[in-house]
Amino acid sequence: MAASVDRQYHPAPMSGVVRTPFSNHHRSDSPVRNGYTFSNPPSSNGVVKPGEKIKLVDNNSNSNNGSNNNNNRYDSDSEEDDDENEMNVWNEMIKKGNSELEPSSVDSRDEGTADQWIERNPSMIRLTGKHPFNSEPPLTRLMHHGFLTPVPLHYVRNHGPVPNAKWEDWTVEVTGLVKRPIRFTMDQLVNDFQSREFPVTLVCAGNRRKEQNMTKQSIGFNWGSAAVSTSVWRGVPLRDVLKRCGVMSSLKGALNVCFEGAEDLPGGGGSKYGTSVKREFAMDPARDIILAYMQNGEKLSPDHGYPVRMIIPGFIGGRMVKWLKRIIVTTTESDNYYHYKDNRVLPSHVDAELANSEAWWYKQEYIINELNVNSVITSPCHEEILPINAWTTQRPYTMRGYAYSGGGRKVTRVEVTMDGGDTWDICELDHQERGSKYGKFWCWCFWSLEVEVLDLLGAKEIGVRAWDESLNTQPEKLIWNVMGMMNNCWFRVKTNVCKPHKGEIGIVFEHPTQPGNKSGGWMARERHLEISDSGPTLKRTASTPFMNTTSKMYSMSEVKKHNTADSAWIVVHGNVYNATRFLKDHPGGSDSILINAGTDCTEEFDAIHSDKAKRLLEDFRIGELISTGYTSDSSSPGNSVHGGSVYSGLAGLAPITEAVPLRNVALNPRVKIPCKLIEKVSLSHDVRRFRFGLPSEDQVLGLPVGKHIFLCANVDDKLCMRAYTPSSTIDVVGYFDLVVKVYFKDVHPRFPNGGVMSQHLDSLSLGSIVDVKGPLGHIEYLGKGNFTVHGKPKFAKKLAMISGGTGITPIYQVMQAILKDPEDKTEMHVVYANRTEEDILLREELDKWADEFRDRVKVWYVVEKAEEGWKYDTGFISEKILRDHVPAVGDDVLALTCGPPPMIQFAVQPNLDKMGFDIKEQLLIF
C-alpha cells in the first residue's frame, strides 16, 4: 500500500496526528542514574517554587556509605547507556513540547477565587465552570505532542481550591501501624532516599464520561476523551518510605495504606481528600508506586500536587492523592468521604437515590483501582473534512489514535471496523516504552491504520477497540453507571458527506461528543432524534451517504438574534428551542428565560431542571445548532453565555437591553458576577446571615423589589443554582445580605442529604467567591401599592402576605421597600408559618416593624409545635386564621405568598378561594 500523506483539510491548525518520533528504548523501572541529587538542596536559604527546573549532580564519585542508599543498580555498561539515552530522548521531547506552548497566565475567570494566583494554559477546556479547576486539553493538541504531555496541557482534576504550599514548610507524616512514625520534610524525601524517574500515563476514571451523560445523566461532569496524559515522574518509592518507618506485617493488622491530602473540601460535611490501597500493592516493587515531587524535569506545578503527590502506575487518577500530607497504615481501608462516594462503578440499575438509601457506596466489590482497556480515534478529528477528488482518492488515509490499559498490562492489539463490527482491520502499534524489568507497561501507546478513501466514503461510521495481554477488550455498547466512570465502549466516529467548497464534496467526521458543555457530536443529535415524534425514520445506504437534512440547522449568530420576548430562542445540548410560546406558562416567570434568550444555557438548564422539565423541552425544539467549522459562523467563548434557567419572557415584555445605568449597578442579566463572602453571622443553630461584597465598592446590586437572584456554585463538581431574595435594602452600596436557613444532612427524614446549596454556603470561608446572576422573577413592586406581574399592572391598598419558612424573604423585601417610603401608605397583614418558634426567620425585624407601624403592619405567626406560653396560633394555616388576620377580599386587596409548594397548594389557595379571592388575578405567587 502506498505511503500515507498528510493531505486532509483541518478546520483547526493542529490535526490529530501523533508527531512524536518513535522510540522503543524506554524502561519504566530505571532509577535516577547513579543516584542524582539536587546540586543545591532546598533549604531555609532559598524558596523552592512550583515548576522550578532541577539541576542534577552525579554522585558516582561519592563513597557508598549507605547514608543516601544510592547504590549503583546497573549490571552492565550497555544498560546504563540505554538509560542515559532514554533520558536524553525524554529531555528532547519535553524541551520541544514546551517550546511550542503559548505562555501560561492567570485566567480572568480565576480572579476573585482561591486559585487567582495560579498561572494556567489558556487552551485548557474548563469542565466545571469557574471553580474548582477541572480541565482537559483539546484532543488535537494533546495528540500533537505525542508520547509526553507538556505539564500545562496535562489534564487537571481538582475537588476544591489548590493549596498555596511552600517547600520549606511542607511535611509528610507517616503514622498508624508503623514502628517508627516519622514526619518527613521535603528535603529529607529528596536527599534521604534513592529516587526513581519514569514515564506514567495518568487517566481519570471519568475519561469519556460525556458519552455516558448523553445516554443518561450521571452525577459527574462532562469529561471528553482527553482526560489522559503522560509525564515523566520522579519521586521516592513508597515501599522504601514505609520500610524506613518500620511498617508492621499483615499478621499484625497492617492491611491498608491510606493517603490524605491537604485541601479543605465540602464533602461529608468537610474533609480532606483521602483514599487507600492495599498493603500488598504498596509494598510490591513491581507496582512502582512513588511519592512524586518532579514532573517532566521540573518541580510539580500547583495543579498537579506541589510539592508532593502519589503516583500509582496503572491505577485511576483518583487514587493518586495530590498535596500529600499524611500516610496512615491501617487495618481497614480509608474511611474518607471521597474514598466511598467517588470512584465506583455501581450496577446500571442503581441511581444516586438508591445508592444512598441502600448503601451501595460501601460495597467493596464496586471500587475502582486499575484502569480498564480503552482506545480512542484521534484522527480523523472532530469536524475534520476530507475532500474527495482525483488526488485524495489515489492515496490512503491514515487513521490514528491512542490506547491504554491498567495494571501494567500491555496493549497487544488495536482493531478498526468500518462496517459495524462485521470485519476488523489490525492496526500498527507504536509502544514508546520497553516495559519494566517486571514486564509492566505503564504508558499509553499509539495506533495507526491506512485505509482507502473510497472505503471511508461508503462507511456509516468508524469504530475502534483495543485488546491487552490478558485478552481484555472493549464492549460494543456503552454500560451506564451512576458515576459515569470507566466508559470504554467502542469509540465511534460518524461520517457524512458535505460540500466544503463550491463544486466540491468531502467527508466530514463527527466524534460522539465534545468535552464540557460544548455543543457538537453525533450523540447529542441522535439522542434528540430518537425521542422526537416528528420527522421520518432516517435511513442510509453505503451508496447514498448524506448529512442529516430532516432537522433544520441554525448557526449561533442566528440564535443570538432571537433574544426578546417576541422571539426567545435558547440552545441546550446542541439543540435549538423556540421558547416564546412558553413564556407566559413558565413557573419561574418570563425573566428566567429572557436572561438566557439567544444563548447556550445548557449548564444552567441542567442545574435547575428535573427530568420532567427536560422532556417538556422537546415540544419546543426547532432544530440543531451548527457546530461544524465549514458551515457555522465562528464564535468565541464570549459569544455563548452559560447561564440561567431555560425560558424567559412574556409577549408583552420589552426585550432585555444593555442600557447605560443611571447608577453603577452590579447585576447584568447576561453575565454571572463574582461576589466575595465578606461576613458570616450565625443567627441560630441553623440560620446564617451571609454578606457578599459586590465586584466594586461603589455598586448597588440593582435588584428590583420583588425579584430574586440566582446563586451559582460548583458543589461536588456539578453546577448548583438556587434562587434567593436578599434581606438588605435595594439601595445599599457595595454588598448584599442573604439570610439563609441551613438544611443539614440527616436532620429531615425526607431529605437525608440536606440542602446542597445551604450546606455549601455554610461551609464557605471568608473570601470565598460565589457567582450571582439576575434579576429574575415575574413580580416587581414599583411603590405606593403598584405591582407589575408578568408585565401587567396591578394595584392594592392592602396586602395579605402569607409566607412559610424561608419564603419570608421576598415578603420581607416588599415590606422593607414600603416602609422605607414615607409616602407609601400600603397596609401589610403578614401570616407567617413555621415548624417551630426557633425556625422563624427575621422575627426581630418583623416584630419591630409591627410595633413601630401599628396602623399598617400586622404580623401573626403559626407554628406546628409550640412551647408553653405561645400567644399565636399552632397547627397549619387555615381558613379561620386567614379570616382573622388578613384583609377581606376587595378590589383594593392583593394576596402575596411564598413558601413550600404544599402550603400554597393545600392551604393558601383553597382557603383564599373560600374567602372569595380571585386566585388567578388577586394571588401573586413569588
UniProtKB/Swiss-Prot annotation:
Catalyzed reactions per annotation: nitrite + NAD(+) + H2O = nitrate + NADH + H(+)
Cofactor(s) this protein requires: FAD; heme; Mo-molybdopterin
Residues that, per the record, bind FAD: 722-725, 739-744, 751, 756-758, 809
Family: Belongs to the nitrate reductase family.
Record note on cofactor: Binds 1 FAD per subunit.
Subunit structure: Homodimer.
Protein name: Nitrate reductase [NADH]
Gene that encodes it: NIA
EC number annotated for this UniProt entry: 1.7.1.1
Key word Heme present: yes
Species this chain originates from: Spinacia oleracea
Function summary: Nitrate reductase is a key enzyme involved in the first step of nitrate assimilation in plants, fungi and bacteria.
Enzyme class, spelled out: oxidoreductase
